[in-house]
Amino acid sequence: GTSNPHYDEDNHLASFLNKTSAKAKTEHACKRYRIKQKPGEQWVYHTTEYWLLGVAMQNFWRKKHDEKSDFYTDVLNPLWRELGLSPVLDEPHRQTGQPLTGWGLTLLRSDIAKIASMLSLEKSVFTRHLDQSMFKKAMQREPSDRGSVEGSETLRFQNGFWAWDASSVLECKEEKWLPFMSGYGGISVVLLPDGDVYYYFSDGGIFRFAEVIEHLNSTNPIC
């Protein structure tokens, strides 16, 4: 029913994916959701916004270089090589040449583990390649800015990453925000201290991981 937190996303996903050109997808993403609040007042998540971000990135990159340039090939593929990821990431799904940002990647389990582990380390290849102010906030390393409240006081969203305050579950003496990635259908990738990672992929709509984190904390303290 409409009480499902994913209803808005589920209800309109097929109509977006069925569009057969990049232009049609962009028009759909721009017009599909009626403006209900002034910008900055109400936090709303739609994966179609990541498509729009990808279109903007491609346009920016081509204006900076030339019309044949491609931000995925030119920027991301070299980063994937540096991270030692598998060749399945070399070519994303596309729509008339535009990377299908938001949905278009195929990854091996080892790719997930490598990316997540590097993200959770304070010093990694991402230190050189990403805007450090935005990255630190996304990784919850900037206590003054935890991000937008999402559903409850223990959940935040910041620069593309979710975060959960695990302090009450783990009985920490102070806040312990764990960044995590969440994917459609039942995907969770939780970034733990010092390069540790918990990830779970399913199609069953299961997003719970607090019990697992509590168990991991008993063997390798997270607080």
Model-predicted segments: where are they?
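Active-site-adjacent helix/loop patches that line small-molecule binding or acyl-intermediate pockets
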Residues: 1-85, 109-113, 117-121
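Active-site Gly/Thr loop motif
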Residues: 85-90, 137-202, 206-209
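Active-site-proximal binding-pocket segments
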Residues: 74-140
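Substrate-binding/catalytic groove segments of enzymes
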Residues: 5-6, 63-64, 122-127, 168-172, ...
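Solvent-exposed loop and edge beta-strand segments that line ligand/cofactor-binding
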Residues: 37-46, 98-106, 179-183
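Short, gly/Ser/Thr-rich active-site loops of penicillin-recognizing serine hydrolases
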Residues: 209-223
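Alpha-helix boundary/capping residues
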Residues: 33, 119-122, 141-142, 216-219
